[in-house]
Amino acid sequence: MGAILGKKIGMTRLYNNKREAVPCTVIQAGPCFVAQVKSTEKDGYDAYQLGFGERDEKKVTKPLAGHYKKAGKTPGYLLSEVSKSLIAGELEAGATVAVDVFTEGEIVDVLGVTKGKGFAGVVKRHNFGGGSRTHGQSDRLRAPGSVGGSSDPSRTFKGTRMAGRMGGENKTVRNLEIVKVMPESNLIVVKGAVPGPKNSYVKIVSTTK
């Protein structure tokens, strides 16, 4: 069991014992620090607030800078909470969480923010089939078609799939296998793809499902 914050480096391939190429994602996982310890008595639940990365103190608000100062740390780039049950032992504010909380072969969930695609049409965003390519039609190839009824219901239903902003959403990819752990360089290699572009921040937690 473990939990850590990290940065997506990119994708590569490794070869297994059957000489098969396995697509993998390389993640710089930690080292993280405990910015705050939350308890049931004080906060209503048990959790560790982890910090990752470094940020110029001028670029954080004074309350946030003071929050880091309580833990004896310089401002981090990312703050995120993880359940105490995911990390063995009792940690105090300022303690370090390294990549060695995970082992090779462990199954994890990776949380991140998907790549932003901007404003996208219905064919790209919702996989619509588009209009017919025949009978002389010329400009409706990627059009959405009708979005509502005539006199009944006389409105467009809420939630109707239309063009709009695509991507940039929180996403969890579950049940990825850790192929390799490299404590000396703070790297984890997981089988498969994880959300987001290169250099985006992710959270890795042991799977609970």
Swiss-Prot record:
Designated gene of the protein: rplC
Keywords carried by this UniProt record: Ribonucleoprotein, Ribosomal protein, RNA-binding, rRNA-binding
Family: Belongs to the universal ribosomal protein uL3 family.
An example Gene Ontology CC term for this record: cytosolic large ribosomal subunit
Organism: Chlorobaculum parvum (strain DSM 263 / NCIMB 8327)
Any coiled-coil regions, as ranges: none
HAMAP family in the cross-refs: Ribosomal_uL3_B
Record region (Disordered): 128-166
Protein's name according to its UniProt entry: Large ribosomal subunit protein uL3
Gene3D superfamilies (alphabetical): 3.30.160.810, Translation factors
Any single Pfam family the record assigns to this protein: Ribosomal_L3
GO annotation, biological process: translation
Function field: One of the primary rRNA binding proteins, it binds directly near the 3'-end of the 23S rRNA, where it nucleates assembly of the 50S subunit.
A GO molecular-function annotation: structural constituent of ribosome
NCBIfam families: L3_bact (TIGR03625)
Classification via PROSITE patterns: RIBOSOMAL_L3 (PS00474)
